[in-house]
Every structure is written in C-alpha cells, then in structure tokens.
Amino acid sequence: MKVLIIGANGQIGTQLVDKLKDSKHEPVPMVRKEEDLNTFKEKETEPVLADLEEDISHAFEGVDAVVFTAGSGADTGKDKTEAVDKKGAVKAINEAKSKGIDRFVMVSAFGADFEPKEWPDSMKHYYEAKAAADNHLISSGLNYTILKPGRLTDDSGNGKVDIGERTQERMGEIPREDVATTIREILDRPNTYQASYEMLEGDQPIAQAVERI
C-alpha cells in the first residue's frame, strides 16, 4: 500500500517513514520545504513537496492511504494551530475523499474528545482544533482510525501499549516510536476502521494489542 505521510518531518512522521520502508507498505513523505526533499530521497523514498496551508491536491495522486501526523504543537498560537491542526487536517480529509482514498489514519491528542470544561485554558485552542478535525473525519465516510496518544516522549519505544476506546489510566505518556509502530500495525487492519483509540505506554505488545481491539 502506498501511504502518504503528512507531517513526515515531525518526530512521529520521520520514524513512520523508516518503519514503513521496512514493511510491505511504501511511504510517500510530504514535506513543505525543498531542502527537505533530499533528506527523504536519501532514505530511498519519493517525497512530495506540498504545504498544508496551500494547494495539496497533487500530493494525493496515486496513493492508497493517508496518515496525518502534522501538528503545530500545543505551544503555538491560535492562528497557526487553526491553520494546521484544524483547516489543514480538514483539507487533507476532503482531498482524500475526492481522490477516492478511503483509508485515513489521524494522530490526534489524548483528551480531544473530553468535555471542553476539562481542557486547560492555555491549551483550549489546541484541543478545539483537534476535536474539530476528528469530528470531520468521523463524518467523512472514510475508513478512518483516530489515535489519541498521551504525552509524547522521545524515549525509545518498548513495543508495548495500553490502547482502547478508553485506556486504563486517565493520562500518561507514550514514546513517539511506539505511536509510529502502532500506525504501521493498524494501516491495513479492518478491525480498526471507523474507530478512535486512546493510547498510552502499557504492557501489551503492539501487534497483539492491535489484533484484540
């Protein structure tokens, strides 16, 4: 399966490119700066140049699935968050639908589906954007999976997670590497279609956890 990775320059996206290269899937990294093209060409992939805040239609040609890992970050201002996390995501969802690409994986945020009163004031704009994008994907008719990881860390992944509609703990951490591994595992698993999952580090091997959800 040819997989467009939106946000390939991010820490999850970069690791996902490497993991898909070593699988049966073919990653197509989407980058917004020309100087980043060579980085991914050196990885023996065929990157595509596109900016979420501009036209991205060409990036979707010939792909079978889309993974949205882009994000402005919780510390950015409201305008940038709105442009990337909400409008950029909605644009990608609409483009996938128009191109007949029915598999879409969204990396969202733990808590995006909580009641707004539970969101910290300093991050309210971030959660609002994530929630709006998730809801648009849910209503799109695509074969979606929404992953809502807890606090992301740069620790090496241990290959074990707590994943489900609701995790056992109400908040926690997870290495970015384990998020990337989980995306690789769920890409072509129909049992994860039309579903949203919280995910934290846990004690269940990822492949086994994905098979059981």
Each language-model region and where it sits:
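Active-site beta-alpha turn of Rossmann-fold NAD(P)-dependent dehydrogenases/reductases
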Residues: A70, V105-S108, G150
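Conserved SDR Rossmann-fold cofactor-binding beta-strand/turn motif
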Residues: V31, K148-T153
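NAD(P)H-binding glycine-rich loop region in Rossmannoid oxidoreductase-like domains
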Residues: P29-S98, L187-N191, Y197
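Structural motif
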Residues: K2, D64-A65, R103
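Conserved Rossmann-fold NAD(P)-dependent oxidoreductase catalytic core, especially the SDR/UDP-sugar
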Residues: I6, E26-M30, E34, T76, ...
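Non-catalytic, hydrophobic alpha-helical segments
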Residues: I12, V66, L147, V179-I183, ...
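N-terminal Rossmann NAD(P)H-binding glycine-rich loop of SDR-like oxidoreductase domains
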Residues: M1-H25
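Active-site-lining helix/loop region of Rossmann-like oxidoreductase modules
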Residues: D154-G157, V161-I213
